[in-house]
């Protein structure tokens, strides 16, 4: 099972599509206008080559990479309610409580 886990976590991300399409360009402009980029960070840099570990296994090919995930991969405390809408679903997933949401990566959407 560890091999499957390693494989799944090492898969490449989908390529961005239709980057010159006017509708995609408008969507990107709206993304910044709505300040989505404050949580959905466009560009991140991985740790130096040779320092990326997964379950104690070095993954040198994942180091020194520039990625465009449109996420910060963090858990955010969304509170129990925002503007009168209850966001706490009481669903525990891993270490995340029901009021914590991970910023979903938007890579490959275009």
Language model: regions and residue ranges:
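Electron-transfer interface patches adjacent to heme c in soluble/periplasmic c-type cytochromes
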Residues: 1-110
């Amino acid at each position: 099972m560890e091999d499957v886990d390693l494989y799944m976590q090492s898969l490449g991300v989908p390529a961005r599509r239709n980057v010159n399409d006017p509708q995609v360009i408008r969507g990107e402009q709206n993304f910044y206008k709505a300040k989505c980029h404050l949580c959905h960070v466009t560009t991140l840099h991985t740790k130096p080559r040779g320092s990326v570990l997964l379950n104690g296994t070095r993954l040198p090919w994942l180091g020194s990479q520039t990625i465009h995930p449109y996420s910060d991969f963090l858990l955010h405390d969304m509170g129990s309610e925002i503007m009168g809408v209850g966001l706490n679903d009481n669903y525990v997933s891993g270490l995340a409580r029901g009021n914590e949401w991970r910023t979903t990566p938007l890579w490959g959407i275009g």
